[in-house]
Curated annotation (Swiss-Prot):
One Gene Ontology MF term: tRNA binding
Source lineage: Bacteria, Pseudomonadati, Aquificota, Aquificia, Aquificales
GO BP: rRNA catabolic process; rRNA processing; tRNA processing
SUPFAM superfamilies tied to this protein: Ribonuclease PH domain 2-like (SSF55666), Ribosomal protein S5 domain 2-like (SSF54211)
Pfam families: RNase_PH, RNase_PH_C
Self-association and partners: Homohexameric ring arranged as a trimer of dimers.
Cross-referenced InterPro entries: ExoRNase_PH_dom1, ExoRNase_PH_dom2, ExoRNase_PH_dom2_sf, PNPase/RNase_PH_dom_sf, Ribosomal_Su5_D2-typ_SF, RNase_PH, RNase_PH_bac-type, RNase_PH_CS
Gene name for this UniProt entry: rph
Role, per record: Phosphorolytic 3'-5' exoribonuclease that plays an important role in tRNA 3'-end maturation. Removes nucleotide residues following the 3'-CCA terminus of tRNAs; can also add nucleotides to the ends of RNA molecules by using nucleoside diphosphates as substrates, but this may not be physiologically important. Probably plays a role in initiation of 16S rRNA degradation (leading to ribosome degradation) during starvation.
Residue positions binding phosphate: 86, 124-126
Protein family according to the UniProt entry: Belongs to the RNase PH family.
Catalytic activity: tRNA(n+1) + phosphate = tRNA(n) + a ribonucleoside 5'-diphosphate
Name recorded for this polypeptide: Ribonuclease PH
Swiss-Prot/TrEMBL keywords: Nucleotidyltransferase, RNA-binding, rRNA processing, Transferase, tRNA processing, tRNA-binding
């Protein structure tokens, strides 16, 4: 039995509130269980020096945790003087995941900044950031297209992420902090709406896992991502094959998983 009584393939309750920030081109508050992340997408009309004159844009992500997002207060990284290795790893993961579904040439010479601020952490902050960030980025891309600054929406596909792992002797989906802390194996999976992989991170903790266990984690992860993309489609209507993307009118959506397909 899992600490919160969920089935092995059951997501925590998911809630997304759109336009959480009144200034950003795109913003959401995403909740996955007790994990809560605010995400904003901001467009800047310039690119990093290495892209100047190329006609290509860039997407970069920043990630931070509020001091009391965890059980005990942590020191702000700006006070420490530099982001930790963990923070840098997560920022790169979020950026890679979003660049995987955006045509940077169509974006033109502009930068999309994605800021992910964890206000409460209970496991899965990086995957919640990616899943929520897609909606914020999509809203920003739709606004950019409707303004006439780009000819065609740069979005290529949906993208979402989820954690899975082995806790005790059982493969489970969407680990909370207690499960993550005791997991033998932890996997983070990032996939597109068309079923392609952007990233697979799987690590054993004093444990080596079998091909069969890996396949089962992958199966559970794909199941979870399909559910999350279904939620994204409540906010964004997309037909990637013809480059059609539309912002739907819904502002808030809550989803309770029953653990089925």
């Amino acid at each position: 039995m899992r600490p919160d009584g969920r089935k092995p393939t059951q997501l925590r309750p998911v809630k997304i509130i759109r336009d959480f920030n009144i200034y950003a081109e795109g913003s959401v508050l995403i909740e996955m269980g007790n994990t809560k992340v605010i995400i904003t997408a901001s467009i800047e009309e310039k690119v990093p020096p290495f892209l100047r004159g190329t006609g290509q844009g860039w997407i970069t992500a920043e990630y931070a945790m509020l001091p009391r997002s965890t059980e005990s207060r942590s020191i702000r990284e700006v006070v420490r003087g530099a982001p930790s290795g963990r923070t840098q790893e997560i920022q790169r993961l979020i950026g890679r995941s979003l660049r995987g579904v955006v045509d940077l040439k169509k974006l033109g010479e502009r930068t999309l900044w994605v800021d992910c601020d964890v206000i409460q952490a209970d496991g899965g902050t990086r995957v919640a950031s990616i899943t929520g960030a897609f909606i914020a980025v999509a809203d920003a891309m739709i606004k950019l297209t409707e303004s006439g600054k780009v000819r065609q929406n740069p979005l290529k596909d949906y993208v979402a992420a989820i954690s899975t792992g082995i806790v005790g002797n059982e493969v489970v989906l969407d680990l909370n902090f207690k499960e993550d802390s005791s997991a033998k194996v932890d996997m983070n999976l990032v996939m597109t709406g068309s079923g392609n992989f952007v990233e697979v991170q799987a690590t054993g903790e004093e444990y080596s896992f079998t091909q069969q266990e890996f396949d089962k984690m992958l199966e559970y992860g794909k199941l979870g991502i399909n559910k999350l993309i279904h939620i994204q489609k409540k906010f964004i209507e997309g037909m990637p094959s013809i480059g059609h993307w539309k912002r739907l009118s819904i502002k808030e959506f809550s989803y309770t998983d029953t653990g089925g397909n």
